[in-house]
Protein backbone atom coordinates (compact mmCIF):
# COMPACT_ATOMS: atom_id res chain seq x y z
CA UNK A 1 0.00 0.00 0.00
CA UNK A 2 2.94 2.33 0.59
CA UNK A 3 3.79 2.20 -3.11
CA UNK A 4 0.36 3.46 -4.14
CA UNK A 5 0.70 6.38 -1.74
CA UNK A 6 3.81 7.65 -3.51
CA UNK A 7 3.52 10.49 -5.96
CA UNK A 8 4.78 9.85 -9.45
CA UNK A 9 6.03 13.12 -10.93
CA UNK A 10 2.83 14.43 -12.41
CA UNK A 11 1.41 17.75 -13.38
CA UNK A 12 -0.94 19.27 -10.86
CA UNK A 13 -4.57 18.22 -11.20
CA UNK A 14 -6.36 21.56 -11.57
CA UNK A 15 -8.44 22.83 -8.66
CA UNK A 16 -10.43 26.07 -8.78
CA UNK A 17 -12.58 26.78 -5.74
CA UNK A 18 -13.98 29.84 -3.94
CA UNK A 19 -11.79 31.36 -1.24
CA UNK A 20 -12.97 32.83 2.06
CA UNK A 21 -13.89 36.07 0.23
CA UNK A 22 -15.87 34.32 -2.52
CA UNK A 23 -13.16 34.77 -5.18
CA UNK A 24 -12.26 31.80 -7.38
CA UNK A 25 -8.68 30.65 -6.70
CA UNK A 26 -6.88 28.39 -9.15
CA UNK A 27 -4.12 26.07 -7.96
CA UNK A 28 -2.40 26.09 -11.37
CA UNK A 29 -2.12 29.91 -11.30
CA UNK A 30 0.58 29.49 -8.62
CA UNK A 31 3.17 28.20 -11.12
CA UNK A 32 6.55 29.67 -10.22
CA UNK A 33 5.95 29.16 -6.50
CA UNK A 34 6.58 26.15 -4.27
CA UNK A 35 3.12 25.18 -3.04
CA UNK A 36 1.88 23.11 -0.15
CA UNK A 37 -1.50 21.74 -1.23
CA UNK A 38 -3.19 21.00 2.08
CA UNK A 39 -6.48 19.15 2.50
CA UNK A 40 -7.86 20.24 5.86
CA UNK A 41 -10.85 20.26 8.22
CA UNK A 42 -10.84 23.29 10.53
CA UNK A 43 -13.33 21.58 12.82
CA UNK A 44 -10.88 18.78 13.65
CA UNK A 45 -9.25 18.65 17.08
CA UNK A 46 -5.70 18.91 15.70
CA UNK A 47 -6.49 21.90 13.46
CA UNK A 48 -5.25 24.70 15.76
CA UNK A 49 -1.85 23.08 16.30
CA UNK A 50 -1.49 22.30 12.59
CA UNK A 51 -2.33 25.90 11.66
CA UNK A 52 0.40 27.16 14.04
CA UNK A 53 2.98 24.95 12.31
CA UNK A 54 1.83 26.09 8.86
CA UNK A 55 1.95 29.74 9.93
CA UNK A 56 5.58 29.36 11.04
CA UNK A 57 6.52 27.79 7.70
CA UNK A 58 4.57 30.41 5.77
CA UNK A 59 6.17 33.30 7.67
CA UNK A 60 9.63 31.78 7.18
CA UNK A 61 9.41 31.00 3.45
CA UNK A 62 6.65 33.07 1.82
CA UNK A 63 9.02 35.86 0.75
CA UNK A 64 11.13 33.22 -1.05
CA UNK A 65 8.19 31.97 -3.11
CA UNK A 66 6.36 29.52 -0.82
CA UNK A 67 2.56 29.45 -0.87
CA UNK A 68 -0.08 27.36 0.85
CA UNK A 69 -3.26 26.39 -1.02
CA UNK A 70 -5.49 24.98 1.70
CA UNK A 71 -8.69 23.16 0.75
CA UNK A 72 -11.30 22.99 3.50
CA UNK A 73 -13.72 20.10 3.80
CA UNK A 74 -15.69 21.58 6.70
CA UNK A 75 -19.41 21.12 6.14
CA UNK A 76 -20.37 24.67 7.18
CA UNK A 77 -19.20 27.45 4.86
CA UNK A 78 -19.71 30.18 7.49
CA UNK A 79 -17.56 28.23 9.98
CA UNK A 80 -14.86 27.86 7.30
CA UNK A 81 -14.90 31.62 6.65
CA UNK A 82 -14.62 32.54 10.34
CA UNK A 83 -11.78 30.04 10.87
CA UNK A 84 -9.76 31.32 7.92
CA UNK A 85 -10.36 35.08 7.98
CA UNK A 86 -7.03 35.83 9.70
CA UNK A 87 -4.91 33.34 7.73
CA UNK A 88 -2.48 34.91 5.22
CA UNK A 89 -2.43 32.08 2.67
CA UNK A 90 -4.99 30.88 0.13
CA UNK A 91 -7.89 29.10 1.83
CA UNK A 92 -10.60 27.61 -0.37
CA UNK A 93 -13.75 25.69 0.47
CA UNK A 94 -15.02 22.66 -1.42
CA UNK A 95 -18.83 22.71 -1.23
CA UNK A 96 -18.97 19.07 -2.39
CA UNK A 97 -17.40 17.98 0.89
CA UNK A 98 -16.64 14.28 1.19
CA UNK A 99 -18.23 13.63 -2.22
CA UNK A 100 -15.72 15.88 -3.97
CA UNK A 101 -14.08 14.63 -7.16
CA UNK A 102 -10.93 16.44 -6.00
CA UNK A 103 -10.53 13.94 -3.15
CA UNK A 104 -10.74 11.10 -5.67
CA UNK A 105 -8.36 12.77 -8.14
CA UNK A 106 -5.69 13.21 -5.47
CA UNK A 107 -6.37 9.78 -3.90
CA UNK A 108 -7.12 11.31 -0.49
CA UNK A 109 -7.85 8.55 2.01
CA UNK A 110 -7.80 10.70 5.14
CA UNK A 111 -7.69 14.36 6.12
CA UNK A 112 -5.39 16.09 6.83
CA UNK A 113 -3.22 15.20 3.85
CA UNK A 114 -0.79 17.45 2.01
CA UNK A 115 1.40 17.52 -1.08
CA UNK A 116 4.40 19.59 -2.13
CA UNK A 117 4.23 21.05 -5.64
CA UNK A 118 7.37 22.47 -7.27
CA UNK A 119 7.73 25.76 -9.15
CA UNK A 120 6.85 23.99 -12.44
CA UNK A 121 3.42 22.84 -11.20
CA UNK A 122 4.67 19.27 -10.76
CA UNK A 123 3.47 17.19 -7.82
CA UNK A 124 6.63 16.12 -6.03
CA UNK A 125 5.83 14.49 -2.70
CA UNK A 126 2.96 13.43 -0.50
CA UNK A 127 3.07 13.89 3.28
CA UNK A 128 3.86 10.23 3.99
CA UNK A 129 7.04 10.58 1.87
CA UNK A 130 8.31 13.63 3.79
CA UNK A 131 10.29 13.33 7.01
CA UNK A 132 11.33 16.98 7.44
CA UNK A 133 8.82 19.41 5.93
CA UNK A 134 11.03 22.45 6.57
CA UNK A 135 13.97 20.87 4.70
CA UNK A 136 11.66 19.75 1.90
CA UNK A 137 10.37 23.29 1.36
CA UNK A 138 13.94 24.64 1.37
CA UNK A 139 14.96 22.04 -1.21
CA UNK A 140 12.19 22.91 -3.67
CA UNK A 141 12.64 26.66 -3.17
CA UNK A 142 16.22 26.12 -4.35
CA UNK A 143 15.05 24.58 -7.62
CA UNK A 144 14.33 26.93 -10.51
CA UNK A 145 11.45 27.17 -12.94
CA UNK A 146 11.97 25.26 -16.18
Q: Where would I find each of the regions flagged by the language model?
A:
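N-proximal helix/coil linker or "cap" segments that precede and/or mark the start of modular domains
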Residues: 1-18, 28-31, 59, 78, ...
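Generic structural signal for well-ordered beta-strand positions
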Residues: 25-26, 124
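Conserved redox-active cysteine motifs that mediate thiol-disulfide chemistry
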Residues: 31, 38-56
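Alpha/beta-hydrolase fold active-site loops
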Residues: 33-35, 112
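Hydrophobic beta-strand anchors of alpha/beta hydrolase catalytic cores
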Residues: 36-37, 68
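Structural microenvironment flanking redox-active thiols in thiol-disulfide oxidoreductases
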Residues: 48-85, 98-102
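Thiol/disulfide oxidoreductase modules built on the thioredoxin-like
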Residues: 97-142
